Amino acid sequence: MEKMTIRDVDLKGKRVIMRVDFNVPVKDGVVQDDTRIRAALPTIKYALEQGAKVIFLSHLGRPKGEPSPEFSLAPVAKRLSELLGKEVKFVPAVVGDEVKKAVEELKEGEVLLLENTRFHPGETKNDPELAKFWASLADIHVNDAFGTAHRAHASNVGIAQFIPSVAGFLMEKEIKFLSKVTYNPEKPYVVVLGGAKVSDKIGVITNLMEKADRILIGGAMMFTFLKALGKEVGSSRVEEDKIDLAKELLEKAKEKGVEIVLPVDAVIAQKIEPGVEKKVVRIDDGIPEGWMGLDIGPETVELFKQKLSDAKTVVWNGPMGVFEIDDFAEGTKQVALAIAALTEKGAITVVGGGDSAAAVNKFGLEDKFSHVSTGGGASLEFLEGKELPGIASIADKKK
């Protein structure tokens, strides 16, 4: 179902309350990485060009439903005003008369940021009173926060019961690309999964098995699968309670004719730190006790490249190793480059949020994919085929 977007509504002179994702790292009152703020700029600029008055709602971090200075959005207001080249008014409150007054004084083309939505206990409880208050401030709700789409909170879902909710450009792009790879992928379709835990990816493996031709598995989760196949994995990270499940998933894939490709070698070390002694071992020879696999090895990189070479659709979620440390980053980097090269050849390539997005940024490849998702948990749940409350609450386009 197509969702209504900010293009479908008249914004001239209207008050727009926009749920954005300004959940950025802040240190000593300074924004450390403004990627998420920049991602919201096209929607914000469009609303301002159309003559709207814009009020922003966002959370930052996980405060416990009460004000907490280290989670204040004040540094975000400062960074946003630098990026927009205009003053961003800031109210250090979420509800109350101070908020009402600031909204009443807003003029066309002006913007106002309210304090962290999670400073109020009603936000994560989806409290209708809080949602109603925020709705009373505006004519239209614009949801541009895909990162919280899997959560039913007052600022993205509750508010939509009181005023119309439409998608911003970022939300629209997320829905478009994730829908394509989840429901309507062009074949051959290859899924690349990594990261630490099998348990995080069970739903994705199960759902995408119905559609994918191949699933390539790297990252620490590979060791749970390798152990399920009777391989010696030394002191590598294994989810012991998920070994039987890994066996089941491998069996299921066989039944469905989906090829699951596991690593044939690994880069191992005795500690997870820079500059330690490291070796490459073949998986069939086993990883010795006291050593742990921290990246896929060079043979696996070649194998994965070969298995990706004819792909028309690729979804990548989770790094191949401990990419934060350069000694163990090569596998992730090479896989990222291989997928980026497919984008050049016309394939649809989607990178799930979270660590994969961080890896892509680290290697300076963020522009080399069809889409890099801004939501970690939200993109996983979308790929699992679940309906996300933060998308369901956006108005459908009229046929």
Swiss-Prot record:
Chief location: cytoplasm
Binding site residues for ATP: K201, G293, E324, G353, G354, D355, S356
Biological processes annotated in GO: gluconeogenesis; glycolytic process
Subcellular location: Cytoplasm
Keywords of the record: ATP-binding, Cytoplasm, Glycolysis, Kinase, Nucleotide-binding, Transferase
Enzyme class: transferase
Residues involved in substrate binding: D21, F22, N23, R36, H59, L60, G61, R62, R118, R151
Domain of life where this protein originates: Bacteria
Assembly, per entry: Monomer.
HAMAP family: Phosphoglyc_kinase
Name recorded for this polypeptide: Phosphoglycerate kinase
Organism: Thermotoga sp. (strain RQ2)
Record gene name: pgk
